[in-house]
Amino acid sequence: MKLTCVVIVAVLLLTACQLITADDSRGTQRHRALRSDTKLSMSTRCKGKGASCRRTSYDCCTGSCRSGKCG
């Protein structure tokens, strides 16, 4: 009986700790833009440096389109 109570209290304590840390870590991802650009270039075909591009299509591997050329 005592062991059962100890196990129940331990499980409740660990669950509470996980919920508290999950709320605290929301929105704290570092380098979010860098990570999404990396995923984009890995999942889609992208154009190399100097290729023609449009600013609205985001198809350059570098992520930047200046004056119609990937930079």
From Swiss-Prot:
Disulfide topology: C46-C61, C53-C65, C60-C70
Chief localization: secreted
GO MF annotation terms: ion channel inhibitor activity; toxin activity
Tissue: Expressed by the venom duct.
Residues of the signal peptide: 1-22
Residue numbers of Cysteine amide PTMs: C70
GO annotation, cellular component aspect: extracellular region
Pfam families named in the record: Conotoxin
Domain of life: Eukaryota
Keywords: Amidation, Disulfide bond, Knottin, Neurotoxin, Secreted, Signal, Toxin
Compartments reported by the entry: Secreted
Propiece residue ranges: 23-45
Domain notes: The presence of a 'disulfide through disulfide knot' structurally defines this protein as a knottin. The cysteine framework is VI/VII (C-C-CC-C-C).
UniProt family annotation: Belongs to the conotoxin M superfamily.
Note: Found in injectable (milked) (IV) venom.
Function: Omega-conotoxins act at presynaptic membranes, they bind and block voltage-gated calcium channels (Cav).
Protein name from the UniProt record: Omega-conotoxin-like CnVIIG
Species, as recorded: Conus consors
